[in-house]
């Protein structure tokens, strides 16, 4: 039973519990009209201390399509946070009005602190460069739906692997499935963190390698997970400008790829995927965005215990 649980890290749910969420998402995709009123009378609070388009809209659309309502803020300056209110006090107050909360915060661990003080389920909608578990559920549902399996895959992760919380969460999650391998492509300054390399991959004897050129790995990949270099994580603008266009996926590089490879991206993109890839059937990032709404619908329904 997932009722009343928090989702702070992709490892919080067992593989069986994840499959439970995915099966419900499948049902919602097949017959959405059956779920139009399952959250009647329920309220989701979206507590976004950082800018967001897809994640916030996806959560809000998910709750509305389940028949529930949404309250919240999209920037801290529009709430009592601007007056210095703590995360603990904010979630305690919000718990008086809402049944479930989704929180995005620039500080790592902030949603976990909120969960400690909360009487309602808390979903981590991204905390700093740490984790983004609902994006991971989105990615897993997309791969599962389009590939048919989450095992025996070679996954390439490209771009900002140091600050990219979506990559950290995805590697952790896919490491739990059988016979998956990873290829990491990034500038030296933005390499995958040591804790992912040592505590997740090496500790569990999971095969991985790091390459400097995309072309060196494209032919073996089943999934290519592109990420942008995140301007908001840099203190030095010169460093950002120097690194932002390090890896760009275009039609020429796609010539090296398998016919059934999938290109994913958590979005927003900047320059790292050329617009010509939008016309390539292997470009699955907008399908991925839609799967994000469905998996959040399933997650909300499970945590509230209405399904």
From Swiss-Prot:
Annotated metabolic or biological route of this protein: Pyrimidine metabolism; UMP biosynthesis via de novo pathway; (S)-dihydroorotate from bicarbonate: step 2/3
- Residues bound to L-aspartate: 83, 165, 228
Asked if 4Fe-4S is a keyword of the record, the answer is no
Signal sequence annotation? none
PROSITE patterns to which the protein is assigned, alphabetical:
CARBAMOYLTRANSFERASE
What's an example GO BP annotation here? Answer: 'de novo' UMP biosynthetic process
Q: Which reaction does it catalyse?
A: carbamoyl phosphate + L-aspartate = N-carbamoyl-L-aspartate + phosphate + H(+)
Superkingdom of the organism of origin: Bacteria
Instruction: Kindly give the Gene3D superfamilies that the UniProt entry links to this protein.
Output: Aspartate/ornithine carbamoyltransferase (3.40.50.1370)
Listed EC numbers: 2.1.3.2
Q: Does the keyword Nucleotide-binding apply?
A: no
Binding positions for carbamoyl phosphate per the UniProt entry:
54-55, 104, 132, 135, 267-268
Keywords from the UniProt entry: Pyrimidine biosynthesis, Transferase
The cross-references to SUPFAM superfamilies, in alphabetical order and at most eight, read:
Aspartate/ornithine carbamoyltransferase
- What Gene Ontology terms describe what this protein does at the molecular function level? amino acid binding; aspartate carbamoyltransferase activity
Enzyme class, first EC level, given as a word: transferase
Homology family: Belongs to the aspartate/ornithine carbamoyltransferase superfamily. ATCase family.
Q: Provide the function of this protein.
A: Catalyzes the condensation of carbamoyl phosphate and aspartate to form carbamoyl aspartate and inorganic phosphate, the committed step in the de novo pyrimidine nucleotide biosynthesis pathway.
- What HAMAP family does the record tag this protein with? Asp_carb_tr
The annotated subunit structure for this chain is:
Heterododecamer (2C3:3R2) of six catalytic PyrB chains organized as two trimers (C3), and six regulatory PyrI chains organized as three dimers (R2).
UniProt-recorded name of the protein: Aspartate carbamoyltransferase catalytic subunit
Its ancestry begins with: Bacteria, Bacillati, Bacillota, Clostridia, Eubacteriales
Record gene name: pyrB
């Amino acid at each position: 039973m997932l009722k009343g649980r928090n989702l702070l890290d992709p490892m919080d749910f067992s593989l069986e519990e994840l499959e439970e969420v995915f099966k419900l998402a499948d049902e919602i995709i097949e017959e959405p009209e059956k779920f139009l009123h399952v959250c009647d009378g329920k309220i989701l609070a979206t507590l976004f201390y950082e800018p967001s388009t897809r994640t916030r809209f996806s959560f809000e659309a998910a709750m509305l399509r389940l028949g529930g309502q949404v309250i919240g803020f999209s920037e801290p300056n529009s709430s009592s946070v601007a007056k210095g209110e703590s995360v603990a006090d904010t979630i305690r107050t919000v718990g008086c009005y809402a049944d479930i909360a989704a929180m995005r915060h620039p500080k790592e661990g902030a949603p976990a602190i909120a969960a400690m003080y909360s009487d309602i389920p808390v979903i981590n909608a991204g905390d700093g460069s740490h984790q983004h578990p609902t994006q991971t559920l989105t990615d897993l549902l997309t791969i599962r739906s389009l590939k048919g399996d989450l095992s025996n895959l070679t996954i390439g992760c490209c771009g900002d692997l140091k600050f990219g919380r979506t990559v950290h969460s995805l590697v952790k999650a896919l490491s739990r499935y059988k016979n998956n391998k990873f290829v990491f492509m990034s500038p030296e300054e933005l390499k995958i963190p040591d804790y992912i390399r040592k505590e997740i991959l090496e500790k569990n004897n999971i095969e991985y390698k790091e390459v400097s050129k995309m072309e060196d790995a494209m032919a073996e990949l089943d999934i290519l997970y592109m990420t942008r270099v995140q301007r908001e994580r840099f203190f030095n603008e010169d460093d950002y400008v120097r690194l932002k266009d390090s890896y760009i996926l275009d039609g020429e590089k796609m010539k090296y790829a398998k016919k059934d490879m999938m290109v994913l991206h958590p979005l927003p993109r900047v320059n790292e995927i050329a617009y010509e890839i939008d016309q390539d059937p292997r470009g699955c990032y907008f399908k991925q965005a839609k799967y994000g709404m469905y998996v959040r619908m399933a997650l909300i329904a499970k945590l509230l215990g209405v399904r």
